[in-house]
Amino acid sequence: MAKDTNKTVKVRLVRGLRGTQSRHRLSVRALGLNKLNDVRELKDSPQVRGLINTVHYLVKVEE
């Protein structure tokens, strides 16, 4: 059976970036999130999952 390559994941920025590490701010920007409560629908890939794991305390993930 072939893998479903169209899987996506919704990511929402739920906490502000003040007081966070610069690496984490860059990870949030790489996910395409700019302002509080921004939502992006991204392709579910290991790279995106790694960025989400880095900033798990700032974002909310909806499968």
From Swiss-Prot:
GO cellular component: cytosolic large ribosomal subunit
GO molecular function, one term: structural constituent of ribosome
InterPro entries, per the entry: Ribo_uL30_ferredoxin-like_sf (IPR036919), Ribosomal_uL30_bac-type (IPR005996), Ribosomal_uL30_ferredoxin-like (IPR016082)
Keywords for this protein: Ribonucleoprotein, Ribosomal protein
Record bears the keyword Repressor: no
Single Gene Ontology BP annotation: translation
Highest rank taxon of the organism: Bacteria
Pfam family, one: Ribosomal_L30
NCBIfam families: rpmD_bact
Assembly information from the UniProt record: Part of the 50S ribosomal subunit.
Matches recorded under HAMAP family: Ribosomal_uL30_B
Family indicated by similarity: Belongs to the universal ribosomal protein uL30 family.
Designated name of the protein: Large ribosomal subunit protein uL30
Protein source organism: Xanthomonas oryzae pv. oryzae (strain KACC10331 / KXO85)
